[in-house]
Amino acid sequence: MKSLFMAAIVAVLSLGSVIAARATDLDCVSTTFNLLSPNDKVCVSVFEDPQVPGVVCHISQARKGGWGQPLGLNEDPSNFSIACRQIGPIDVALSKLGQSEEVFSQKTSIFFKTTRIYRIVDQPHRTIVYLAISTKIVNGSPANAISTVPIMPWPH
């Protein structure tokens, strides 16, 4: 029984590492000037789909400045954009991917708000759709954006 419990814990932990992509900030551009505190800014981040080698996504997000920023207390606005592209051969079979899976998640407030990106498979059109949404536990946000990646042959 104990070994079954440990196996379940290992499976859950390894599943989390397979699902969640890590984003790297490329650059941030200030959008306001605050004399005595950090500026509001828009940051561009990049991540690769962990289950679809050959796809890279860039997401831009507004980030709130002020004194709450260094402490992580600010709630970032639900303003974002996403662009995903095929940058290499895509050899994974679309039928092996789930119809809809979360591939990226980033907290945008200390408590209840998160930006999530889902991969949605459109098998009839051989396309992968990436849907970015902002969530809140109490009132969900209608903010969303999509990017599509048609699977194209890649020259070798």
Residue ranges and their predicted role:
Residues 124-156:
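C-terminal partner/receptor-binding element of secreted or periplasmic proteins
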Residues 54-121:
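Mature extracytoplasmic domains of secretory-pathway proteins
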Residues 16, 40-46, 69-73:
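Short, intrinsically disordered, charge-biased short linear motifs at domain edges
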Residues 1-4:
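Positively charged n-region of N-terminal signal peptides that target proteins for export
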Residues 18-23:
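Sec/Tat signal peptide C-region and signal peptidase I cleavage site
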Residues 26-47:
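Extracellular/luminal recognition modules and glycoprotein regions
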Residues 7-16:
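Bacterial N-terminal signal peptides
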